[in-house]
Design a protein with these regions (language model features):
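Non-heme di-metal
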Residues: 1-96
């Protein structure tokens, strides 16, 4: 589905931005604590955006199930792959 691909691309962008901001927060933690806090807050905000987009992916899949039954296996395989990749990246960002 085109919508899922668009959302997955946006989720990936949000993850990259969250990671970038977290790296900057760590870089400036000692020398510029207030700036580091801004970067930390931006990282958290990007994670929130990611969660909002993911919720929409889940809703699209649920709607498809209600209207058509189980989604095609290839579609779910791609979703499962991307979801696992995103969750792994999110865990890595949180562990910093």
């Amino acid at each position: 589905m085109k919508e899922i691909q668009v959302l997955e691309d946006l989720i990936s962008e949000e993850m990259e931005d969250s990671d970038k901001y977290m790296d900057l927060a760590l870089e400036y933690k000692e020398s510029w604590p207030e700036l580091a806090k801004v970067f930390y807050d931006l990282s958290i905000a990007e994670s929130g955006h990611r969660d909002m987009l993911h919720t929409q992916v889940v809703r699209i899949i649920e709607k498809y199930r209600r209207e058509h039954g189980e989604p095609p296996a290839p579609m779910m395989a791609v979703y499962d792959y991307l979801h696992k990749k995103e969750m792994s990246k999110a865990a890595m960002i949180k562990s910093k």
